[in-house]
């Protein structure tokens, strides 16, 4: 205690010192500024008053005070009303009591029903005028007129007292308000008055027989069997006894109580009418859908609604989809809810062309708007708009993806391992993406009662699955130990389900990659800077080079190199003839002078000048590049540069070192910042250009891999690289004339193996660059050729790595490759090298050690399938699915970087309208109001004129009875089907193996049974109708065509049988419900030689019969001499089948049985394969192919190689080059090309990567692994590429 006064004194002294210091400081400020503290405060206050933010805050404060005063006045007003009501009730009670006392009666606070002296009976009239009559069962003759009047007056008073009491209960919010209603009709009949939170007389919603929901009052709860029934009296007359899953609460549930799969009743606006329908919650609110709920209604429509437009179902079923009557809709909902959040949807943006199914036919349509998970489709033929769920199989990319698994299963029968079928290029067209609930806010379906969800949402990412094989060998090995039997590998090509179209050649560009083949002892030629050809010995013969410096500490920067400084002196041109002496002063004196430099910078180091000029053309500023030679000559085109190099005999500069793209900078360097780990060259001199390694995240070193830039044949693999197995040229001009070069001609002639058989004379390298993928491969000059290896324009991949790359550690994808300099479009980057294995050995090794670095050498299969139009899930031609009109128009402008122009995609801009309202939420469908109106009124008449929104195009009129309802007649068009078919036949050539559509790049073949069938999505007809034309003879055909032509401009085939489904295209007929097929059997038809003489007028549309008994999706067989099927324009209208699974497919399935996939392998295909599903087939005499045995069996090309049946595999796990580190991207900047260098064996091409676009320095190099999602059972691999077109999943 003695220390306490000392502490207090110390504090007081400290305070005194501080106050003195403050006073001194204030005095110093006053002396320095020359004003007093009061003046300074006044000056500061004035300055603050002048500030806009202060004035704004004061204004807001004044508004807040005004608002508070207003609210206080409103509260006072409400209190006054409450007091007045209380006084009125008190006065009323006093008046009632006085009146009772005058009558000699005793007043009690009880129900009026208890006071009744006579029992009453309730008579229910079960009609629409459901009125309740109360009939007295006593003797009416014993009453006097006076007593009758008194009783009527007392009943009126009691009713008034009850109304007042109800009002008081509502104001005071008494919890016991329901006790006043126990004396209701349910008590009199001995029924339940309460069932959980359901209480008699409460307001609820009930479902009527018209499938619509209406508000009403719960009047009774009855026990029926093991469950309960609820009697509802609707406000708009009528009563119904309903189950618990057919009534809903009359309040809006909180957002946290709703999850994906919740059963709700939601509002649906159709024009000016509002309906209440039951549905399933498909999306919970998030930023992308503008905080709205996506509802899948029971009848197949989808719509976004707000929380205030939802009502929860009282007693939903455990599996909510079982409450849906439509079987196909129920199947779709079950699949959707159980798979959530993995939702495959088509990635779309405004302006794209896509094929959409309607009434069993594929129509050309355009994307008008994308709103979250919905897309507004405009049908180009009749200008009709419709909102469709982006995951609906009515969209061709989704339909192709769904049918690809069935097609792959049929094609892969008998193999030891089923591999993904990947062969299409990824472009800006529609692709199927797998969305993930990455935010974790959405809740998955819980098969329990809604108030207590038990299943938490699935984590957005697996604990530690590397998204690419570069995620670290240690992590990969630990995962392989856990799942030794389920492994997956990248694919070096692109999926056929994607969309791509070529620009300069008849084949579409693609990303294909094949590994180069060569023995360990085979030497690889490369160019030295002096131009001499050197021979790189085998890895075993190379002496061990000294280890490069390795840094393991934090550095400010990686070792920097001096920047290039352009010379200041000008070059003047004097007229002369360029020759060898023009470059004499810059020819290098020593070997490898500029090795490791940016190849685009090397010409400048030899005194070339690269100048960029500008000029305005059509009000647009354009740029172009000019090279100025050391002798002063200006070179403006690649042709001039090529001529100059040959005239001067320049063997130290090459065509790939020059670039005329003004947006490619030759001196833009990328410098890593503060690396933790740095290696100068991880190849230890094995590559011509050093490959540095940088880790800017941690100190983890790269995996230990034996580096080899050559392919290494494994056990049982023999690659014939002898000169006798090669075709060589004898060119003396550097192979510039493709018509005279034998190697160039191999490349050109191989393009005839494409649909249509068109030869592209410009195929191959164009000035040492490849603008797009060539599906049939590139044949480079080889060691048998007599051309100069340094001057030859047909040698590129064999020269090895030229661009400067760097291995670096990514944030979430392991190790990756990035470029240190800009790379021009079409430039060669690197190859994919590794150990070549047989199929059987790869199966064994993949299951034991992992398959993440496997790549298929399937060049033979890809070209054969491409030639036949074999793939069922490939893109359509340029005027069909997946073409972006905006990209086509702006693709060649040259004034904007194409990779930066991504707008209005369904990922980055789900919702275009910022100021949305509830009116924009509702989707107007073409036949929505019509079908529902018929349900309401019980009529089967056609739609009235005002039952369609005004933006749906011309009004629909009834279909003439002569035309079958639900037929596949196209909407109005300028061309008739006859003209289309005639022009279509005239532009196609006849071949024995099949026929190809030169416009769509598709071809057809018949199945074994000889029946031309078109598979597709399933379709519903509400009334008994067929979806195709069953015409027996030619007269019927012509008559139907004539009627179709006459009525085409007047009708749009929208009748009671046509229903457009927002998310599910395949409901069945209400009468005689049967389960539709779960898969679609895709069959194609091959045209025979006799088709050349077929009559173009004999055209039938392949369609399915809704009443098929033994056949599925086949039209009626014609008689001899007639046709079995025809085609309208295959790019304009395609008919799909909706029957059950094909018998052929079932037979094949049962014969061999599906083989479960255990490993996923990359495919080295690099092109898009035309879709042939859902095709309409040209008519021909099919009598010769009615029996499957009459069709010849075609032998696979690979079987000519000693009967081989499986392709070879490249494994780069333990030994390979830098290609193994290239990561995946759904929007890659590299594509893959098969190149034949040291052998012309079709089984062993080199797999080369080329730039698909200009690439800025520092950008990671990626390509599309193209795994087939779901190809490996039980394995899921998410994608984190970050691209706008990201598909969400790899496996």
Swiss-Prot record:
Record flagged with keyword Transit peptide: no
EC nos: 2.1.1.366
Composition-biased stretches (Basic and acidic residues): 1031-1050
Record region (Disordered): 108-147, 404-545, 868-1160
Biased composition, class Acidic residues, residue ranges: 124-133, 896-907
This protein's GO CC annotations: chromosome; cytoplasm; intracellular membrane-bounded organelle; nucleoplasm; nucleus
Tissue: Widely expressed. High expression in testis.
Residues that hold Zn(2+) 1 according to the record: 729, 731, 735, 741
Composition-biased stretches (Low complexity): 528-539, 1100-1115
Positions bound to Zn(2+) 2: 729, 743, 781, 785
Annotated residues for binding of S-adenosyl-L-methionine: 813-815, 851, 853, 1220, 1223-1224
Function: Histone methyltransferase that specifically trimethylates 'Lys-9' of histone H3. H3 'Lys-9' trimethylation represents a specific tag for epigenetic transcriptional repression by recruiting HP1 (CBX1, CBX3 and/or CBX5) proteins to methylated histones. Mainly functions in euchromatin regions, thereby playing a central role in the silencing of euchromatic genes. H3 'Lys-9' trimethylation is coordinated with DNA methylation. Required for HUSH-mediated heterochromatin formation and gene silencing.
Protein name (Swiss-Prot/TrEMBL): Histone-lysine N-methyltransferase SETDB1
Gene behind this protein: SETDB1
